[in-house]
């Protein structure tokens, strides 16, 4: 076997033995792209004239292939949501890239660097009335990476993380509603009415499921509804729950409150 297609070694000192397919894969690897995502930069703003959009000076990378739209006009459908696609067909050697306005996002994820076919990638959503453009929404530019390490980060939008929920019948009337954000933070809501419990007892009900268990003991404080008194519980690494409030007899006392802890 032979390792080929170096980008760092030129046997003739005049050119790299790398083809366009290899170059396309390099772009995608460096930016965390897949075949349904794009990179786009408008060097000047597109112009909307009646039922047309003109890309005056826009750079796009799709499928690892870089191209420029210079005064490229797309005809739009009236009273519609127009999904603007870049279509890359490498068999059309004279004009391998075309633009189309379609009625849905028809991005198809075709791997043009390792196989064949026409790659379609949506990069703009343009809404029209009967006479002109009413709104434009560029497709979000997405990267998929295994890990990121940064010194500083500023976020102007939202951060979406996986969310799991769990209700625990802790026993003795106490109930916990757990909401886990990512694999880091658990938010706990106390509810239910507690009875027949003494300080230091392990509660008699269900233990916390393994995915919600902390690495170290976590102490959470709640309060008794309508009273000026509080209590706390320990959630232990094995999932058991220990009561550290006052001793309570058979008369139930309603609980309320919220707490949180980090799993790790």
From Swiss-Prot:
Which Pfam families does the record match to this protein? Caudo_bapla_N (PF20747), Caudo_bapla_RBP (PF08931), Caudo_bapla_RBP_neck (PF21564)
Query: Where in the cell?
Result: Virion
Alphabetized, the UniProt keywords read: Host-virus interaction, Viral attachment to host cell, Viral attachment to host entry receptor, Viral baseplate protein, Viral tail protein, Virion, Virus entry into host cell
Primary site of residence: virion
Spans annotated as Host receptor binding: 164-264
GO:BP terms for this protein? Answer: cell adhesion; entry receptor-mediated virion attachment to host cell; symbiont entry into host cell; virion attachment to host cell
Q: Does the keyword Repeat apply?
A: no
- Which GO CC annotations does the UniProt entry carry? virus tail, baseplate
The answer to whether the entry has keyword DNA-binding is no
The entry sums up its family as follows:
Belongs to the skunalikevirus receptor binding protein family.
Q: Quaternary form?
A: Homotrimer; found as an assembly of 6 homotrimers. Interacts with host phosphopolysaccharides; this allows the virus to bind the external cell wall layer. Interacts with the distal tail protein.
Report the protein's function. Binds to the host phosphopolysaccharides at the onset of infection. Upon activation by calcium, the receptor binding proteins change their conformation, presenting their binding sites to the host, and a channel opens at the bottom of the baseplate for DNA ejection.
Q: Could you give the domain comment from the record?
A: The C-terminus is involved in host receptor binding. Host-recognition domains point upwards, towards the capsid.
Q: What is this protein called?
A: Receptor binding protein
């Amino acid at each position: 076997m032979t390792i080929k297609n170096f980008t760092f070694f030129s046997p003739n000192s005049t050119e790299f033995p790398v083809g366009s397919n290899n170059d396309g894969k390099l772009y995608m690897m460096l930016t965390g792209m897949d075949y349904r995502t794009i990179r786009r930069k408008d060097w000047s703003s597109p112009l909307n004239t009646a039922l047309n959009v003109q890309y005056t000076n826009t750079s796009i990378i799709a499928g690892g292939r870089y191209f420029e739209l210079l005064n490229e006009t797309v005809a739009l459908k009236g009273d519609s949501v127009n999904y603007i696609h870049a279509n890359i067909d490498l068999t059309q050697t004279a004009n391998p890239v075309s633009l189309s306005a379609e009625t849905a996002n028809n991005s198809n994820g075709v791997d043009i660097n390792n196989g064949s076919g026409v790659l379609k990638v949506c990069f703009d959503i343009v809404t029209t009335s009967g006479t002109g453009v009413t709104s434009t929404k560029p497709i979000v530019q997405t990267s998929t990476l295994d890990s990121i390490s940064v010194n500083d980060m500023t976020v102007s939008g939202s951060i979406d993380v996986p969310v799991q929920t769990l209700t625990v019948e802790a026993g003795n009337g106490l109930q916990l509603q757990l909401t886990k954000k990512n694999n880091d933070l658990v938010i706990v809501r106390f509810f239910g009415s507690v009875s027949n419990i003494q300080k230091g007892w392990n509660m008699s009900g269900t233990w916390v499921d393994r995915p919600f268990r902390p690495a170290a003991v976590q102490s959470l404080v709640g309060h008794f509804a309508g009273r000026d008194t509080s209590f706390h519980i320990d959630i232990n690494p094995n999932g058991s729950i220990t009561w550290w409030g006052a001793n309570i007899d058979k008369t139930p006392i309603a609980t309320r409150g919220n707490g949180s802890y980090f799993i790790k």
